[in-house]
């Protein structure tokens, strides 16, 4: 005989259930936001007979739209005699599969008001909906009501609660529930264990999840393909690839054949963790076992191979993919286009873009951004701007990265006005420039020898709450020094030193070079000598800068002495020395 279900819930939850059982009716729920007015029309449509709704329930639920389902319910409640609870359950189940959980709960409440009594299956549907909405307390209250009416919870009921616990950050309750289910005489099935395993991974309890697979087998519950898929996916997300491989071996020993989803998951993980050869070997193994790769398998591998500049392997896979009539998707094309752009092979990238269009594959923001970057890299700014405008015309709106790419292109080409115009347009679209945006504009104004506007952009950046990084400061200091504004650069440098941000070796070189070129070699030498006190080891560039400063000032002995020190300290002189 099974022990009481009350042991399943904590004392706090039990009190909640008890309070909700004091009155009649369902637990209190928020009103549904779904408009049920459509029931009126359907009520009239079904009032003539009962055969119509039965025909739809029998044949038409799999393709039914939400409005039709609402209308069908309206017709059913007005039909006389009333449909059976089994027929209502069939409709509620169909709506639940549409993930309209709040609507199912509202319809269940309406049934109660109309005097249509729920059965165990109805309660299971409603409890599942509460759990899916993360309203576990209401699910438990309904469980209590159901039991008071004499319904014993089934494994389905408890599995729904388990799922609710797992997704409601109550994993300890989920584990306790499974243990108590066993004590109560229930036999957890594969779905129950798989749900708990998924929950354990959600809460970063990978070792417990893997151990549970062995526990399943010990209890005579054989893990299925879905179970193994959940475990493999969880392990791969954590980077535990060796454990994932061990699991593949366990599957093989249990005569459970891994499917394309499981293989693709492991291959993708191998790619992300830079094991491209292992990924290719596993790809070959899956083919040898008769598992046909899909577009996701190919896309992961192609993207990985492109990242490691293995063009011939990537091209071979693309050809193989097309030959097998597996259509590349936007992810596949994006990986290749981005790789070709970074390699400087813009012609090949454009050909792939044309191929996408021929195949009626819509480019996305990554496609356009990669091509815009390619055009900018090759100083084809008008084509980059055209691609940018085409992107917007296709309702694919640029993000901050896209704008930054184009602004940088115009700034490098000394077309700063167009870069500023893009910055304004970006703000009008509600996008906030980031550190890269402002730093790019500062650099662009300095290139145009417009120090005032460069400093204005820096002030606006701070005013807008965008934090400068060391790259921003280096750009500002370099621009001021090269444009003869050493005094202003010194103010910025002193502020930087007082801040929590650490200057880089490049920062010090900028200042030493600026001081030397401004004739303040002694100040440059003082800063150079302070580096060792700051724990900064001078590199060959700083030595060259300081030696050049001494030479420019005619201090040959000091230059020779520093050259000897350079050779003693380790940085090898280069052609600049």
From Swiss-Prot:
Q: Extract the InterPro entries matched here.
A: Pentatricopeptide_rpt (IPR002885), TPR-like_helical_dom_sf (IPR011990)
Name where the PPR repeats lie.
Answer: 49-83, 84-118, 119-153, 154-188, 189-223, 224-258, 259-293, 294-328, 329-363, 364-398, 399-433, 434-468, 469-503, 504-538, 539-573
Query: Which cysteines link up through disulfide bonds?
Result: none
What is the annotated signal peptide range for this record?
none
Keywords of the record, alphabetical order, are: Repeat
One Pfam family recorded for the sequence: PPR_1
- Which stretches are transmembrane? none
Q: What family is reported? A: Belongs to the PPR family. P subfamily.
Q: Which PANTHER family match?
A: PPR_LONG DOMAIN-CONTAINING PROTEIN, TETRATRICOPEPTIDE-LIKE HELICAL DOMAIN SUPERFAMILY
Protein name per its UniProtKB record: Pentatricopeptide repeat-containing protein At1g63400
